[in-house]
Amino acid sequence: MRILIVEDHCDTRTVLATLLSRCGCQTVIAKNIKDARSQLAEMSFDALVSDLNLPDGDGLDLVAEAKRLHGLKAIAVTGRTEAVERERGLRAGCDFYLTKPVDFHQLRCALGIPPHHSAA
């Protein structure tokens, strides 16, 4: 499974990429919407895991675009915990809306990674 991770916080980006790689996923990282759009134009992905508070815009715009143009599974990973924000995320096309700090088990389930794939 090839996953595009869009996250502006370096440590979070690195941890997500490392844990997903240990589960057998191929990960590509982007630190903002501009980088993510470039990656989406260059290669195909099975899923998008994106923060919503990005330095160059709202990650929900990226989610909506990726769903429309590429049909990707989209998972929000965000600090936006309010119910209204969750509703906005689901309307924009998020298949799953996970809040930070991320429960990696929930992320694996959202991506459909079988439990026997270990991140340890």
Q: Where are these predicted regions, by residue range?
A:
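Acidic, metal-coordinating helix/loop segments flanking the phosphotransfer/catalytic sites
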Residues: I29-A47
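Two-component/phosphorelay signaling modules centered on CheY-like receiver
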Residues: C10-V28
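Acidic catalytic/metal-coordinating carboxylates
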Residues: N32, D58-D61
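Alpha4 helix (beta4-alpha4-beta5 surface) of REC/receiver domains from two-component response regulators
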Residues: D61, T81-F96
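C-terminal output helix
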Residues: V84, V102-L111
